[in-house]
Amino acid sequence: MRTTTSRPARFSTTPAWRTNCGPMTDRANGLSAGEFTEDGFLGGQLRLRQPKSGHRAGHDAVLLAAATPARPGDRVADFGAGVGAAGLAVARRVAGITLLLVEIAPQLAELARGNASANGIAAETIVLDVSGGADAFAAAGLAPDSVDVVLMNPPFNDPARHRASPQAARELAHVASATTLESWIGAARRTLKSGGALSLIWRADGLAEVLAAFGRGFGGLAILPVHGDAASPAIRVLVRATKGSKAPLQIYPALMLNDERAVPNKKVQDILAGNGALPLAVSGTAGS
């Protein structure tokens, strides 16, 4: 199902990427009053409604958007879009893209559609299982070799080390199956044009899985580790890959969320406030 909107780690303080405005007072998208909130992202440049419980967008989505290479005219697909945080953040940074928000949960997809409209961003919302096959993608308007950029924040918690959540939506959004990463990257490989870019965020301790999944059809990998602080191991990796590239792997200097006093890094504060992008977004930019 597709719908289109028209254009009309740890922080010591409240994160700049989200200001909780409390529950809304009306009823929308199947949620009763008090069941969802409206939050400010990118220093208030985006206002997003999302469920009060279950999976909620946070700084992973903003960092992913800031690491996504896109330029005006690109067709950009956000796989597993949720309420649209990452894809809409890319659209706020890069004007003139064609944005596709792909989400398996109809309720979240409807929130994403409403969020795009409320923020004046043109976006097509597609209800689709990213793990589905080529026929399902084609029926949804995602033909092979049809997209310039894919970004994704797949479920990445290891089920063997993750305590099951009683909330089905949260479990679906956070816990990976044995084939999640491979199937999502395979879907991106099929959908991207030659030379198209894929950006993803993943657990740092799962980097080996990422490299293995990118082993066929992608090259030019660029990796940016994300640490809570300089004394701690990386907690996330941001990865950009290019379909069909033969370029060698590059590892960028790590991003530290906090300094030694547990104060948010100035660069991170700027990114979360919607001011600027990460190196992965400005190198190896997709498009023709």
Annotate the PLM regions.
Residues A9-T37, Q50:
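N-terminal auxiliary segments of SAM/dcSAM-dependent transferases
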Residues N29-R71:
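Class I SAM-dependent transferase core
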Residues R49, E124-I126, L224:
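General small-molecule cofactor/ligand-binding pocket signal
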Residues S53, S177-A234:
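Conserved Class I SAM-dependent methyltransferase catalytic core
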Residues L64, W184, A241:
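Residue-level signal for inorganic ion chemistry
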Residues A67-A164:
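Conserved SAM/SAH cofactor-binding pocket of Class I
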Residues P154-S183:
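Mobile active-site "lid"/loop adjacent to the S-adenosyl-L-methionine
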Residues P233-S288:
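SAM/dcSAM-binding transferase cores
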